[in-house]
């Protein structure tokens, strides 16, 4: 289970150091193998490989009228491995698609991660909070 936010920096080659609190879980759960793909909100999705296989099967089973979404998720997916320093390489194509340059935010979302450009994430979070809670959360207690 992945949760929490981490402010990180991409190096000049597009590598991101995975926070140590996640490395052991990624090694145990996925032998350090992850899959990175596009997210429709403008960030990237990072899945441990076993979770990716579950997601990929769901996407592959979508009806034909969702063929562009299959292309977006599956056609842009890249398999990467944690290197010996605990880093993953984010491809130039995926970095460009998500507007990632240097400062990024890694969010643990349970079974997977989202990777955002830091400024984009801050702006989208502020906009969401300004709109208030959606109806689905109106009766949710904290």
Swiss-Prot record:
Its main location: cytoplasm. GO terms for biological process: negative regulation of DNA-templated transcription initiation. It is found in: Cytoplasm, Nucleoid. Belongs to the MraZ family. Forms oligomers. PROSITE patterns: SPOVT_ABRB. The lineage of its organism: Bacteria, Pseudomonadati, Pseudomonadota, Betaproteobacteria, Burkholderiales. It comes from Burkholderia ambifaria (strain MC40-6). GO terms for molecular function: DNA-binding transcription factor activity; transcription cis-regulatory region binding. Residues 5-51, 77-120 form the SpoVT-AbrB domain. InterPro entries: MraZ, MraZ_C, MraZ_dom, MraZ_N, MraZ_sf, SpoVT-AbrB_dom, SpoVT-AbrB_sf. Keywords: Cytoplasm, DNA-binding, Repeat, Transcription, Transcription regulation. HAMAP family: MraZ (MF_01008). The keyword S-adenosyl-L-methionine does not apply. This is Transcriptional regulator MraZ. GO terms for cellular component: cytoplasm; nucleoid. Gene3D superfamilies: Transcriptional regulator MraZ domain.
């Amino acid at each position: 289970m992945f949760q929490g936010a981490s402010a990180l920096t991409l190096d000049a080659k597009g590598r991101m150091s995975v926070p140590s609190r996640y490395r052991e879980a990624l090694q145990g759960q996925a032998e350090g193998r992850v899959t990175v793909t596009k997210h429709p909100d403008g960030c990237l999705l990072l899945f441990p490989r076993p979770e990716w296989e579950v997601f990929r099967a769901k996407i592959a089973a979508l009806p034909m009228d969702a063929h562009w979404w299959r292309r977006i998720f599956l056609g842009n997916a890249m398999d990467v491995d944690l290197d010996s320093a605990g880093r993953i390489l984010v491809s130039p194509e995926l970095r460009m698609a998500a507007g990632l340059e240097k400062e990024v935010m890694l969010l643990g979302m349970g079974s997977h991660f989202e990777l955002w450009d830091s400024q984009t994430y801050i702006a989208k979070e502020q906009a969401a909070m300004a709109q208030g809670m959606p109806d689905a959360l109106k009766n949710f207690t904290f």
